Curated annotation (Swiss-Prot):
It holds the Pfam family Ku. One of its GO terms (biological process) is DNA recombination. The keyword Transmembrane does not apply. This is Non-homologous end joining protein Ku. One of its GO terms (molecular function) is double-stranded DNA binding. InterPro entries: Ku70/Ku80_beta-barrel_dom, Prok_Ku, SPOC-like_C_dom_sf.
Length: 253
């Protein structure tokens, strides 16, 4: 596994050399865009809208728009001048109770492993967070952006969660019907609770597969071999909520 970031974790005067690795990977089926007339690959070129010429990556700079068609130009050298402690270090600003951080703030996850010479301090941090039921929060710069991150013990090591800043999270109060209270009967509530308890069991994520991807591969293989695609029938519609709950309970018995 290739490290995404290399630096150190600091808390107080303790400094721990570490490497950071992406915890997840995308396994989507990749498609190319083709010209329907002759099957040729569709290519995209970077063209200047002012002169109409195709430009190379070396000719491209970043610009911040201050008014229509007016920009402040920023070069790679400009970005390197920004004074950030978080470019080579994850500075833990504070520790907190994990229950205080809502799920909505989590973005992506990384594994942190100790680099050479950091094994003891790494284990000490992990063990201390476990025994105090604590998470750490701080910042790190990765791919040209300063990220808010949280650290917590996980499965024998430390995991880093990239977080959304508070101004990046939309308020659910903007949604119609959010928080609304509907009138339900006691029978409906009891049936719903029974259904939940009947469906409740220890979580085994390995039992869940990407069925859309599997169906897509079956479709591709069928088209290759010239076989007919069989479409399954839809689920029969149940008229009322109470009937749906009763039918669902019968199905899980």
């Amino acid at each position: 596994m290739r490290a995404t970031w290399k630096g150190s974790i600091s808390f107080g005067l303790v400094n721990i050399p570490v490497k950071v690795y992406k915890a997840t990977t995308q396994k989507e089926i990749q498609f190319h865009l083709l010209h329907s007339a002759d099957g040729g690959r569709i290519r995209y070129r970077k063209v200047c809208e002012k002169c109409g010429k195709e430009v190379s990556d070396g000719e491209i700079v970043k610009g911040y728009e201050i008014s229509k068609n007016e920009y402040v130009i920023l070069t790679d050298e400009d970005f390197e001048k920004i004074p950030l402690k978080s470019t080579k270090s994850i500075e833990i600003r504070q520790f907190f109770d994990p229950a205080e951080l809502g799920l909505i703030y989590y973005s992506s996850f990384y594994y942190i492993s100790p680099d050479k010479g950091g094994e003891k301090a790494y284990y000490l941090l992990k063990k201390a967070m476990e025994e105090t039921n604590s998470m750490g929060i701080g910042k790190m710069t990765m791919r040209g952006k300063e990220n808010l991150v949280a650290l917590r013990p996980y499965d024998g090591g430390i995991v880093l969660a990239q977080l959304h800043y508070i101004d990046e999270v939309r308020s659910p109060l903007e949604l119609p019907g959010w928080g609304a209270v509907a009138e339900i009967t006691e029978e409906e509530l009891e049936l719903a609770k029974k259904l939940i308890l009947a469906m409740k069991k220890p979580l085994k994520l390995e039992e869940f597969r990407d069925e859309y991807k599997e169906a897509l591969m079956q479709l591709i293989e069928a088209k290759l071999s010239g076989r007919e695609i069989v479409v399954s029938e839809g689920v029969e519609e149940v008229k009322s909520l109470i009937d749906a709950l009763k039918a669902s309970l019968e199905a899980v018995k």
